[in-house]
Curated annotation (Swiss-Prot):
Organism: Saccharomyces cerevisiae (strain ATCC 204508 / S288c)
Highest taxon in the source lineage: Eukaryota
Annotated protein name in UniProt: Uncharacterized protein YMR320W
């Protein structure tokens, strides 16, 4: 598994698949600043976790709540590892992950 050896900016443009993240079927650009080595798989999981976290405010269906609980158990530090602000355009000084909608 490749690791990031130093802080870096990684940009992703992904769209939530409605059958997984109903009703959040919108596109979002995620910019994340990795402040310590992290596995690429973990980065993907954190991006998914962020989608889940945002969708909780949009009447998230039970199936996705269960998936979110699974991710939370697998990565117990994830909530503290993610800072999401849909008004931001740059990674926050405090946070690791900023979402733009």
């Amino acid at each position: 598994m490749r690791r990031f050896g130093k802080p870096c900016i990684v940009s992703h443009e992904i769209s939530a698949r409605p059958h997984i993240l109903q009703p959040c079927n919108y596109k979002m650009v995620l910019s994340c600043k990795v402040k310590k080595p992290i596995e690429l798989l973990h980065l993907q999981e954190l991006i998914l976790y962020t989608f889940m976290k945002i969708c909780l405010h949009v009447n998230l269906i039970q199936q996705n709540i269960n998936k979110l609980s699974y991710i939370s158990r697998k990565y117990p530090r994830a909530p503290a590892f993610i800072s999401c602000d849909n008004r931001a355009t740059e990674p926050t000084k405090k946070g690791f992950l900023v979402c733009r909608m």
